[in-house]
């Protein structure tokens, strides 16, 4: 049976910026946007911590500023003596201390640097998969035909996906989500829809699987699929 893996690097541009600053991409409030332009500029990426406040991945900068302002108004009402004692862009610190003001980092885009990191990650995939079996869908997403490799490595598709994702995390600090399917479509849908509904592991990794039967059971009536 054919087996395909789709891997998406989590909030890639934002994660690269966090790692460059020695920060945890899953715990840091950061957007990638050129603040030298107007606040109507589009954010190229938003970290998961900031998305939890309802900010979409491609928000305009003024939407981020407005959301943060509203969150801080709520936090101020709950803060001791209704005043802030400081600010933080770290989700864990904000959760522990209600007297901290929500802050975020705005990182100027570095497209050439993102390409370098993407290439480095692609080279990690090449340790396990031949280039003809890797389709680069975008700077942060690939499709892999793993069919001919499972017997070679004596592993399941999920084990192979997890091994590659773990090495990417260890060497770049960037985590990922993966979908596994018996065709490219099912792998993509498993990643985009099913993986979002399952709990992440300790590294923020989610891996979901779909075959024709489980697709009918879970998603036959699901809309939209893209």
What are these regions (language model features)?
Residues 1-226:
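Gly/Gly-Pro- and Ser/Thr-rich, intrinsically disordered tail segments characteristic of DNA damage-repair
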